[in-house]
Amino acid sequence: MGSNSFGRLFTVTTFGESHGPAIGCVIDGCPPGLEIAPEEFTHDLQRRATGKSRHTSARREADEIEILSGVYEGRTTGTPIGLLIRNTDQRSKDYTNIAQQFRPGHADYTYWQKYGIRDPRGGGRSSARETTMRVAAGVIAKKWLKQRYGVLVRGFLSQLGEIRPSGFDWDAVEDNPFFWPHAAQVPELETYMDALRKSGDSVGARVDVVAGGVPPGWGEPIYGKLDSELAAALMSINAVKGVEIGDGFASAAQKGTEHRDLITPEGFLSNHAGGILGGISTGQAVTASMVLKPTSSLRLPGATVDADGAVVDVITTGRHDPCVGIRATPIAEAMMALVLMDQALRHRAQCGDVGEVSPLIPGQADV
């Protein structure tokens, strides 16, 4: 299999390349009756889009959704939903000089080794352009989760280079181009990114994503664990090199008396586990974070070889993000929502007759 599909009951298959005529996806398994209109995709697609600030790629795509199937008179029918976005701002000439060169840190060499052929324009299938359709599918999952269970999925940039938030306010996240949770630091980020862009270099980042209102019981033991599927989903995003659930790698320095989340009738006293125990949701907020590497598309020369094995210096002159993490928040939200919707449907299919089990420990009221 080509591994272009995701999910078990709620499945998403994406297609298309960065500089092809269009990108799209097919969503199967969506319950019927969900109201959805093309304009509902706009908000999240624009949050992910390039060209919205000087700190992201200058490529400007309209990202207008066409609903091809699976929706009738504004409601899902239960049949496959086809979504399409036409590419309109490709600049393939930017890649003519490096079409036969393997850019260090990119998928050029690995795609060449696997397939014996590759589309060099904008990275082809390995481009982050593909994530546009994940965000589109995530719009449907987010809406269904919110309407059916009251689940709210949202994220924020929790590290840019060596800079971390010195305060936190969810309201601040949507009021700046960085999805940064502390408004007072935004000028510092602007200055940092301006200097980075002028230097021609790039930098890594970290994104946190949180789902509040997830009921207990979602997830399956062993091979269908909620945290394992969430980790795989986040790791599938371009440039992601590490994922944590809850306290993640910080758990290595903790003692059991610190890490265990004590339980009272009024609720859990902490959430080091990230809302998941034994692969199954606890009713607390599901929390995860992902680390994205610095983009390797740089104006600074780097040593590599070409398709003939000759040693060359490669310089990428196309339009690229100096920090891919800046636009990654809505992508992380989408992937978490897709995992949660798939797990919710699977839980309902197997355990729908179980009902509410006592005692029910309250989750967090606000995340």
From Swiss-Prot:
Residues engaged in binding NADP(+): 48, 54
Pfam families per record: Chorismate_synt
Keywords assigned: Amino-acid biosynthesis, Aromatic amino acid biosynthesis, FAD, Flavoprotein, FMN, Lyase, NADP
Record-linked Gene3D superfamilies: Chorismate synthase AroC
Note on cofactor: Reduced FMN (FMNH(2)).
Protein origin, superkingdom: Bacteria
Name of the protein: Chorismate synthase
